[in-house]
Structure formats: structure tokens, C-alpha cells
Amino acid sequence: MLSRLRVVSTTCTLACRHLHIKEKGKPLMLNPRTNKGMAFTLQERQMLGLQGLLPPKIETQDIQALRFHRNLKKMTSPLEKYIYIMGIQERNEKLFYRILQDDIESLMPIVYTPTVGLACSQYGHIFRRPKGLFISISDRGHVRSIVDNWPENHVKAVVVTDGERILGLGDLGVYGMGIPVGKLCLYTACAGIRPDRCLPVCIDVGTDNIALLKDPFYMGLYQKRDRTQQYDDLIDEFMKAITDRYGRNTLIQFEDFGNHNAFRFLRKYREKYCTFNDDIQGTAAVALAGLLAAQKVISKPISEHKILFLGAGEAALGIANLIVMSMVENGLSEQEAQKKIWMFDKYGLLVKGRKAKIDSYQEPFTHSAPESIPDTFEDAVNILKPSTIIGVAGAGRLFTPDVIRAMASINERPVIFALSNPTAQAECTAEEAYTLTEGRCLFASGSPFGPVKLTDGRVFTPGQGNNVYIFPGVALAVILCNTRHISDSVFLEAAKALTSQLTDEELAQGRLYPPLANIQEVSINIAIKVTEYLYANKMAFRYPEPEDKAKYVKERTWRSEYDSLLPDVYEWPESASSPPVITE
């Protein structure tokens, strides 16, 4: 781990910005925003009332990071690691983001998917300290006063969930708060968005999870989920309260709402507020980026693909709609593009006239039934003969060996995306995909899988189609540009910006996404491209327009190095403060 540490350390008072504070003594150590642990300098200890409250040694952030990594190595349980890492955030915010940024590839699966799903399911059992804002259905009429209780005055990014569809785990109620918290950690770690500008929110309207309603450690309302007009009124009141306090251009990201509400709220609020839904639009952008990367490998334009989805919920529909936009950009009409996309859900293939209900959002991808109607997903593959299958059902190993072999027999280079989270819900493993297609497939997954070595010695590095490639960079650009509304074209631009960062060498390794180790650079580059797009298309409202967009973005990213807490000390000219000599 020493190789990951920043070997050049400079005295904090010289290298760091000065942070003006009013607190002194113990409160500085109890506030994670100002606490440095053993890294307070001697001058800070003496002038800020800390001398004697800490052991005499003065540490660098490097040593603190090294201590963290050595302690982490002693732990074996992912949940134990999660509790330890998030405990660092509660005590020392700068150190938390320093260690996360230094080893993002290894630590992201702990602070976010897949471990965050386990942490959410155990939220009441591992609870240490509340994070974020909790608003319940019982608070109707008083939401603004609750928002006013949040101590930060300059929030620019809100991630909100109602806990109904947490990853592939279903309705977790307020236990879902771990998702907004984890998401905003990645806003900061990947894109440098200031943590004090971020607000995680959980809307509690009850839960239909019977196990939680019987759990003595559950922390939400002990009632069935409210699905009446009162629920809609609460969301309306929340949106108004946030923007009344923090401004109309405050970014509000909807996260893990149920399918019906996710689409409904996106359509309802997108022209009124600065909002997006990561499950719909973020997932769509990262999936499209993977397809655009596959296009580079097989030299087959996206407009010539036939795509079959396993799942027809918000993720599938979001991906499908963005693929349609890309196909239209490549010369097809909207109707021609929609006809190239099929969906298979738990009731079977989406076809006209089927008994199972079809949502209005699914209608563009509901086609006339083929001559032989498939009973299983494998049948659908053999009948429709798709070039690409995309799994977003969250139902486990439904890309069976027979499905994968069928794709390999139909296509020279089959595209197989198993995007469901967490790992246990993935449609197949990377090893299954590469082995059963003899290394010919182009594979991406929603959860991390390690490199796969085939019997002939070839090694493939599967790409992880994680939304983290998209949402931090998009959020940074939107915030810096004072954007008022976020169109789907922004996510199309982000997908293209992501694909453009892949090297030929990485494509040859089987990667459809850049290495996660490069996520900070990737996110900043996406933010730059999206910023350029927003200004070029009159969607940016921060003036004057910066001439150098790259410089503008890079100069406004938050850093994890410690700030100096000392007041500015400087000299005045002696003559300016000396009284004149009075002569009689």
C-alpha cells in the first residue's frame, strides 16, 4: 500500500488553504469537517486550544492513511470493512476521502455496490450515527421546517430515495438511506463535489416489507407503504422546500424509487426542477457507453444491432430510450429504432395483446408477436436472434449456459451485459460468459468480476457497467453550469464522452469501460465534455461563460488535503500603524 501513498508531504500551513473557523478546542476534534486527528500542527494545537488534548506526535495524512489500510487488511467480512470505513467518515472527512480516492477500485465495492446492499439490509443493526435528512409522511405540512434544520446553507446536490426498490433487494423503507449516503460519497470521491454541498434524504412513507415491520431494530414508520395522494403531496412539498431554501438550480437526484413512481416523477418534475433519475438515465448512459465501445471492437454500428432485454422495468426502459436516441443520431427513424429493441419480463415477451398488463412506458417496445411466441428467455433468444442481450431483471442467473451458447451460435461476437446488482442477482458471471463463448463475447456486468483466464491462456478483463462512470461527472457539470433542467441528450453526451476515453489496448483486453482506478480522471473529463455541451446548447446559466472549460472545471474540484485552521497572519507597514511624532 505504500506505493499508493502520496510520498511528497508538505507542511500544512504552507501547502493548504486557510479555512476560517470559529470553534476552538474539543469541538474541532468532534466535527468531522475540521478534525485532522493527529495531523493538527503544533501551531494549530497551541492557538486553537488543542494542546494536551492529543498525544504529542504530529502525523502526516500519509501515515494516517497507512494505518487505515493496515487495519483494513486485518478484516475479512465486507460488512465489517464497511462499518470501519464509514466510521472514518464520521470522524475525519478529509481522511475518509483521501483513502477512498487513493484506492477507489478496491474500496468502492465496499462503500457502494455490492456491500452497501448488505449494509442497507442490516441498517438498524449496525446503526452508529445518523447521516442525512429523514422526512416522513407524518411530517406533511412541515417539510420546510425540517429542511431548515439541516446545518449547511449552500447545498447544491441532493440524492433522495423512498426506499421502495433498493438495488435488487426490494422495499427496505428507511433502511435504504445507505444508498443516498453512498451515492454522495462517490460524488465527492470521483468528481470532487464538496461534501458540505451534498445532502442525502430518505422519504419515509412506510414499507411493505413484513420482515422489517416485525423487526424491533427497524428505524422507520411501522406502517404499510402509503400509496395515496398524500404520498404525492409529500414529494411535491419536499421538492418545493429544497428549492425554496437552496435555489431552483439545486440538483435533485431520485434514487431507487419503485418503477412506476420513478418514471412518473421524472416526467412530472424534469421541466420544473433540476432533476434526474440515476436508475433510469444513469444506467442508460453507462449501458449505451458499453454498446458504443462494443461497436468499436466489432465495427458494427449500433443502428444494426437487435437488442433483447431481460427485464422491462425502469432500468431497461431507460437504456432502451437512450439507445433509440443514439440510433436516431445514426440515421434511423425513432420507429425503426424502437423495432430493433425487444423486452422479456416475468410474464414473457412484451407483445401486443398479451394478457399481462403493459405499462404506457413499455408500449414503444411492445411489438406484434412473432410466429412462435417464446415461453422462456432461451426461446426468445433462439426465435428473435438478437446480437445483444442486456439483463436488468435482478432475478439471478437467468442467462443460463444454454442462453449463452445460443448467443454464441447466433453471433460471431455476441454482446452480453449482465447488469443486475448485487453480485448474487447478476444474470451470469464473467467466467460463464467468456468460457461458454470461447472468449468471443463482449461482456459487461453491473457488479465487479475479476479477470478470466481461458484454457488457451487468453486473459479477459470484464468491464463493470457501473453508474459511477456517469453520475458524478454529470452532476459536477450541472452544478458548475447552474443548469436548470437536465435533458436526456446530456446523458447521451456523457455516454459518448465515457467511450472516448477507452484505449485500443483496453479494448483488446476485453474492457468496455476504462479501469475504475482512473475514475477520477474519467469523471472530470466527462464533466468537461458535458460543460462544453451545456454551454453550446444554451443550457448553462452561470455567467460569464468560462473560455477554458477544462480549467474552469478542474479549478473547482474539492481536494482531500488538510486545510490550515490558523487565521491569516501578516505584517502591516510600520508607518501605517505608528502615530506621528508630535512636536511642541
UniProtKB/Swiss-Prot annotation:
Binding site for NAD(+): R165, N259, A312, E314, A315
Keywords, ordered alphabetically: Acetylation, Allosteric enzyme, Metal-binding, Mitochondrion, NAD, Oxidoreductase, Transit peptide
Catalytic residues, chain numbering: Y112, K183
Record Pfam families: malic, Malic_M
GO terms of biological process kind: malate metabolic process; pyruvate metabolic process; regulation of NADP metabolic process
Segments passing through the bilayer: none
Chain positions recorded as a divalent metal cation binding sites: E255, D256, D279
PROSITE patterns to which the protein is assigned, alphabetical: MALIC_ENZYMES
Transit peptide: 1-18
Family membership: Belongs to the malic enzymes family.
Misc remark: This isoenzyme can also use NADP(+) but is more effective with NAD(+).
Protein name: NAD-dependent malic enzyme, mitochondrial
